[in-house]
């Protein structure tokens, strides 16, 4: 079912530079939340210690797809990447003003904004963004490409990838 091939994320940045991220996946011991925290941190150019993944909540990220195999990491991680890309674009003008350079020169890495041969701490950028009344929350979305299924003709590709498994039992009868 193609409708199960989508993911969402809610990203909120606080003026102190801390980040709250909610996604539609379900953590059940596979390390999904740790993976999503790392994706979020990498996308913003900050340390994972600044990111808090909050419990899955359909009031924050509605209509989530099922979490199965690695699809939870792929689909929700891509939604988080979409959200962090939006936020970087939103913060670039703030950082550019602070650094006296072009928005095109701004990059985020090592918990700093860099541009024009200078840098400013992430926390200073987020505080200035808050003072400038820049929205510090975004929603991210992702849908897997190249899928289409015709339920009448029963053909097509309903999922981007499939889960496979195998079980083996060795039995000794006495």
Which sequence ranges carry the predicted segments?
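Generic long, charged, amphipathic alpha-helical segments
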Residues: 49-55
């Amino acid at each position: 079912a193609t409708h199960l091939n989508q993911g969402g994320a809610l990203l909120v940045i606080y003026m102190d530079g801390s980040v709250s991220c909610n996604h539609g996946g379900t953590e059940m011991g596979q390390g999904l939340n740790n993976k999503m925290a790392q994706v979020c941190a990498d996308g913003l150019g900050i340390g994972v210690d600044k990111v808090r993944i909050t419990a899955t909540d359909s009031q924050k990220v509605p209509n989530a797809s099922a979490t199965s195999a690695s699809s939870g990491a792929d689909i929700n991680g891509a939604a988080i990447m979409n959200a962090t890309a939006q936020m970087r674009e939103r913060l670039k003008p703030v950082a550019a003003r602070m650094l006296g350079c072009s928005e095109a020169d701004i990059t985020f890495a090592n918990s700093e904004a860099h541009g024009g041969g200078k840098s400013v701490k992430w926390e200073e950028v987020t505080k200035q963004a808050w003072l400038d009344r820049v929205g510090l929350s975004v929603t991210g979305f992702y849908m897997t490409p190249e899928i289409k299924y015709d339920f009448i003709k029963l053909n097509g590709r309903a999922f981007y990838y499939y889960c496979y498994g195998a079980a083996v039992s060795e039995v000794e009868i006495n």
